[in-house]
A protein has these predicted regions:
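Short glycine-enriched loops at secondary-structure junctions
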Residues: 92-95
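Surface-exposed interaction regions that form or flank ligand-binding interfaces
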Residues: 1-74, 81-86, 97, 106, ...
Length: 220
């Protein structure tokens, strides 16, 4: 009798196990969805560099968390170092219609009838550039730091955008338009060493601090 009961319950326990596995899988996906979404955009930019900027003089640094003058932190998606300038790249893996201009504090993403607000990425990158200006003040002039905003191809701009805001790989031509050597090889090495020295080690602590910093900026 016991053996028969176990045989009857075995498929039930097996099904319950799969349901629990699916439940936790969905939960984990939802928790990490914003992180994964951001990473997909960053991977796309890294792929653009590999495919279209094959000159070894271009050096791509990814996902840098740096301290600012207030003791807070700022996270930079990409830094592209080159003799022609330093390109500070903010990626946005957003789809749908995008509304915004250079001066607006908040931009809008519209997908069908749903609208979502997000921080102006130009303002975000301005903060990144100011941190870099201070960090590299004795090595490179501020006007050699260039802001680049990259949305994914699924985004559609519904308002005119500044000339440094792009979809997909369009930003590559902008970078290539800078073709005059402005930074020596020695200075590029110094910049790399300075960044390696100042960048914060990746950890859950720095991630939490960055999230809190973003929340505070949105509220201010």
């Amino acid at each position: 009798m016991e053996h028969s009961t176990i045989q009857l319950l075995s498929p039930l326990w097996s099904s319950l196990g799969w349901i629990l596995l699916l439940f936790f899988g969905v939960l984990i996906f939802k928790l990490f969805k914003p992180f994964l979404k951001g990473k997909l955009g960053e991977f796309a930019v890294a792929a653009h560099v590999t495919l279209y900027l094959k000159d070894p003089q271009y050096i791509l640094l990814n996902d840098l968390t740096l301290p600012d003058e207030t003791g807070a932190t700022t996270q930079i998606d990409h830094l592209l170092l080159s003799p022609y300038g330093i390109f500070v790249i903010e990626t946005k893996n957003y789809k749908g219609w995008i509304f915004g201009n250079e001066r607006q504090k908040i931009w809008t993403q519209k997908i069908y009838k749903n609208s979502y607000k997000f921080q102006n990425p130009i303002h975000q990158n301005y903060k990144h550039i100011k941190v870099l200006e201070q960090l590299l003040a004795d090595i490179v002039e501020p006007d050699l730091l260039h802001s680049v905003i990259v949305f994914m191809p699924d985004a559609v701009f519904k308002t005119p955008m500044p000339n440094h805001v792009f979809r997909g790989a369009g930003w590559i031509d902008y970078v290539k338009s800078f073709d005059q050597q402005m930074i020596s090889e020695t200075k590029l090495k110094r910049i790399q060493l300075r960044l390696e020295k100042e960048v914060l080690e990746k950890s859950w602590k720095t991630n939490r601090e960055q999230v809190e910093n973003l929340k505070q900026r949105k509220q201010s």
